[in-house]
């Protein structure tokens, strides 16, 4: 018994050690499980991933989309663009080749934006400071990149050059941010507008905060006008900023008192387009088609009217504007419609404005119809006041295309995903119906300008023109045809733009469908997005790849219904069917080439005889199929024999396999047997 106690104690001690080991193991397991459940993170993972993608982009590795900006090409990845830009997301879904509006984004600005998308860092702008930063801000708003928009606004606020527009003052939706000669950004108006003798305006629709800034003139250290505008007595540089004269399509419209009478606004020379018979001018930018990087001429040059885009002037309730008009202004009034302006200045200020315009030394130029805006029921549709003029070097093809879209004030943000894009002007639309209406309006606007110009100077520069040019002075801009009157010319030119509204931006060739134009542009850029998985060969079209894959699979889906021949490509079958063209008597003919062997040729030739004779000839053929190439003609001949001799295809093949050898002296063109 005494000896058993130590054993029992040892056993108890042994169990206690096992228990302790088990407890330690359980604790270690719990700690391991706890460590596994804890979240782990590599802080630099996302940055390293973007850096790798950016390296791939610079090398063109796995890039699946090309962005064309003017003459510059940028390769990128669709996933990255779609995750960064709502506008680009709607485009990369459908196309591998994107054309951005060069009036909205310049190649240099887009390079900065693309670097920001891949790195999250905005590089140093070119010399110009806030001017370039303003262009980046406008382009980022156009491309709908909220992170870059916020970064640009933050930088501008730090420098004190940015003021945010507050909603509720005017019944307008903001247009696009536009840049003037000097990049100082000021508020459109500060404080509460002075009361005027007008009816109160209903609350406005929410303003678009992405474009809530004005790129105004350099007036450092000078307080703003009570309405946020340059007073008439200050000859400041043109505030080519946001076009606030465009009414919201769904918002309330301003109304005047019943005693007020609408007056035609005095035509402003800076907002007029350049013509071939007037000196080129440069000034404000088109609100519906803004250019965030196009400079305006410095100072008070013609085309840089300080209030060319001022939407806040009120028309004084007087009978006629107190301005004498010369021949140039009479010509302008033939082109322009009456335009009631916004109720934001009183009569005295409006009169000062008119007097200042009278003293302005700017050459008259032919105006251009502006954007129609939605007014109240008792007002006729009027036009806004901001538009783009040509550069000092004369109108370019891009400027001509800009004039096509002057009838619409388009805001991409209000239309969501714009999947239908007008190629000439770059505007996007949510439906094909709106795009078709827009393209038709393109043509009407173009013809309106052409017809009006021809009416103004019908025989300009004719000099020693012949009698035909005098009798038909209206010439088509797309072809050499000329007509007696502009109405006939208008009907003719519709055949150019309405049937082929999509021109190639590289060579100018026009197409009826946007997809056809995109595929055509791939030939210029060498794009072959469709690759064969078996051999790696690449193609520009999907159907070409499908045809190529049949080489690997051996599939021949196209069968000749006359002789039973099979082909991998449809065009080969079409070419083959030409051999079976009907003869003078209407019977189908079989024209076999020299590569078809003697048995097939001779047998088919003799099938033009009676049925018994054909069967006899087939039974005498033998040992002709020793050449493997002759097997290619076995199935067509068997099918042909079965159809005309009443045999099954298996039986016909058996007879042909046992046929004796015959010589190959037979005609190539024979008539198929037709039962009596």
From Swiss-Prot:
One function term, GO molecular function aspect: histone deacetylase binding
Main location: nucleus
Tissues expressed in: Isoform 1 is highly expressed in kidney and lung. Expression of isoform 2 is higher in the lens, retina and stomach, and extremely low in heart, muscle, kidney and lung. Isoform 3 is weakly expressed in heart, kidney and lens.
GO biological process: intrinsic apoptotic signaling pathway in response to DNA damage; negative regulation of Wnt signaling pathway; positive regulation of DNA damage response, signal transduction by p53 class mediator; regulation of transcription by RNA polymerase II
Highest taxon listed in the record's lineage: Eukaryota
Compositional bias annotation for Basic and acidic residues: 8-23, 266-278, 351-361
Cellular compartments per GO CC: chromatin; nucleus
Biased composition (Low complexity): 384-398
Any Pfam family the entry gives: BTB
Region of interest (Binding to CtBP), residue spans: 241-245
Subcellular localization: Nucleus
Region (Disordered): 1-27, 264-326, 342-405
Assigned keywords, A-Z: Developmental protein, DNA-binding, Metal-binding, Nucleus, Repeat, Repressor, Transcription, Transcription regulation, Zinc, Zinc-finger
Function of the molecule: Binds specifically to the gamma F-1-binding motif of the gamma F-crystallin promoter. May have a regulatory role in sclerotome specification and/or differentiation. Isoform 2 functions as a transcriptional repressor in lens cells.
Assembly, per entry: Interacts with CtBP.
Family membership noted in the UniProt record: Belongs to the krueppel C2H2-type zinc-finger protein family. Hic subfamily.
Name of this protein: Hypermethylated in cancer 1 protein
Taxonomic classification: Eukaryota, Metazoa, Chordata, Craniata, Vertebrata
